[in-house]
């Protein structure tokens, strides 16, 4: 189209390029990622101070339990109730 005012013969509908619907092939990421299922777990460990058995029960995903397991094998440890009372004086200073 050239000129100040377009006229009907200036518009050729067959040559118009229509934009592609950009959302037609897209999906929301949450549709692709399934909700991770949480399961109950029992974690048996020992007290760092007196070496008695400590059991922790929780609900978590498999991936979270694997991360927690790595922590327990490296630098994370538990205290039993008796040792936590003695060593930490029930949180009092």
From Swiss-Prot:
Gene3D superfamilies: 3.30.160.330. It comes from Human papillomavirus type 50. The E7 terminal domain is an intrinsically disordered domain, whose flexibility and conformational transitions confer target adaptability to the oncoprotein. It allows adaptation to a variety of protein targets and exposes the PEST degradation sequence that regulates its turnover in the cell. GO terms for biological process: DNA-templated transcription; symbiont-mediated perturbation of host cell cycle G1/S transition checkpoint; symbiont-mediated suppression of host innate immune response; symbiont-mediated suppression of host type I interferon-mediated signaling pathway. Residues 1-39 are annotated as: E7 terminal domain. A zinc finger (unnamed) spans 47-83. Belongs to the papillomaviridae E7 protein family. It is found in: Host cytoplasm; Host nucleus. A motif (Nuclear export signal) lies at residues 65-73. This is Protein E7. GO terms for molecular function: DNA binding; DNA-binding transcription factor activity; protein domain specific binding; zinc ion binding. One of its GO terms (cellular component) is host cell nucleus. Keywords: Activator, DNA-binding, Early protein, G1/S host cell cycle checkpoint dysregulation by virus, Host cytoplasm, Host nucleus, Host-virus interaction, Inhibition of host innate immune response by virus, Inhibition of host interferon signaling pathway by virus, Interferon antiviral system evasion, Metal-binding, Modulation of host cell cycle by virus, Oncogene, Transcription, Transcription regulation, Viral immunoevasion, Zinc, Zinc-finger. Homodimer. Homooligomer. Interacts with host RB1; this interaction induces dissociation of RB1-E2F1 complex thereby disrupting RB1 activity. Interacts with host EP300; this interaction represses EP300 transcriptional activity. Interacts with protein E2; this interaction inhibits E7 oncogenic activity. Interacts with host TMEM173/STING; this interaction impairs the ability of TMEM173/STING to sense cytosolic DNA and promote the production of type I interferon (IFN-alpha and IFN-beta). Plays a role in viral genome replication by driving entry of quiescent cells into the cell cycle. Stimulation of progression from G1 to S phase allows the virus to efficiently use the cellular DNA replicating machinery to achieve viral genome replication. E7 protein has both transforming and trans-activating activities. Induces the disassembly of the E2F1 transcription factor from RB1, with subsequent transcriptional activation of E2F1-regulated S-phase genes. Interferes with host histone deacetylation mediated by HDAC1 and HDAC2, leading to transcription activation. Highly phosphorylated.
